[in-house]
Amino acid sequence: MAQPVQSIDVLLIEHAELELALADPELHSNPAEARKAGRRFARLAPIVATHRKLISARDDLQTARELAAGDESFADEIAELESRIAELTTQLTDMLAPHDPHGPDDIVLEVKSGEGGEESALFAADLARMYIRYAERHGWTVTVLDETTSDLGGYKDATLAISHKGASDGDAVDGVWSRMKFEGGVHRVQRVPVTESQGRVHTSAAGVLVYPEPEEIGEVHIDESDLRIDVYRSSGKGGQGVNTTDSAVRITHLPTGVVVTCQNERSQLQNKTRALQVLAARLQAMAEEQALANASADRASQIRTVDRSERIRTYNFPENRITDHRIGYKAHNLDQVLDGDLDALFDALSAADKQSRLQQV
């Protein structure tokens, strides 16, 4: 959910207050609050830095104009400073536009096969591999938390955790969620299935769900009494002895009926921890969607149309074409896209989202 636009003066005051708070040892007696304050301070830092550059450039421009009155050689410097001020003003306006508070977050991504049997499951596996390859290109970490395979090695369903922590290109603003949040929805494929003997093109689909992962489970209230936790023997690739111990964990959130399973970690405790993280992400997403619906049914409908609509994208193998129906994006490089070359598409989706946010300023 986007946050309302704030004035630079309000943010400058908040930044100064956070700087003082972070220097106070008392804050660090509560590690969770200290981390929360640190994350907010890091998010405000680029805004404050850009504002300071803008003020400095304006002061320099005023000085250059005064000097130019007696020396025409300063005319070129005036033009350069005016261009610099326009650039910084645009940057600051963008930073102050309504933003997604989950932008820096990691994600939990689920891929589910739909109608189409084995072909749909194979396509779901193609999508999972596409996202894994994209993450690898950016130095992100991917953990397969759970998977159910089909007879031909496709995915009936799979759950991935994708994290940018420690990545060379990671920063406080542009996280995994900011890049991949538009992937939720129905993905359609048109190709000749491996099971097709007549060479006919078939259409099938797979679904993708994407959730921002809370920095800490404690950010989402989960009552232990609302949970049913079952353990069973893992069938995944968790490590030695995985098929001889009850290491897999299934957690059911009784009030909502949400079920989360995790079996690919090496121990029952690790699987439980990861399952709780996934549950927290899903409950957070549900709560925010409900709050959005309560605030504005019309706006909620638009959000669902953009983010979770039927057939958000088509992958046409005979024509090597990918089409994103939400923004009219088309490209004839499907083979590269499926190998994780998604930045051009994600840039186009982000640009459309940015334009929408700027219209709210």
Swiss-Prot record:
Pfam families hit by this protein: PCRF, RF-1
InterPro entries: PCRF, Pep_chain_release_fac_I, Pep_chain_release_fac_I_sf, Prokaryotic/Mito_RF, RF-1
Positions of post-translational N5-methylglutamine modification: Q240
Compartment list: Cytoplasm
GO molecular-function term, one example from the UniProt record: translation release factor activity, codon specific
Gene3D superfamilies: 3.30.160.20, 3.30.70.1660, 6.10.140.1950
Family: Belongs to the prokaryotic/mitochondrial release factor family.
Name of the protein in its database record: Peptide chain release factor 1
Organism: Mycobacterium leprae (strain TN)
Gene: prfA
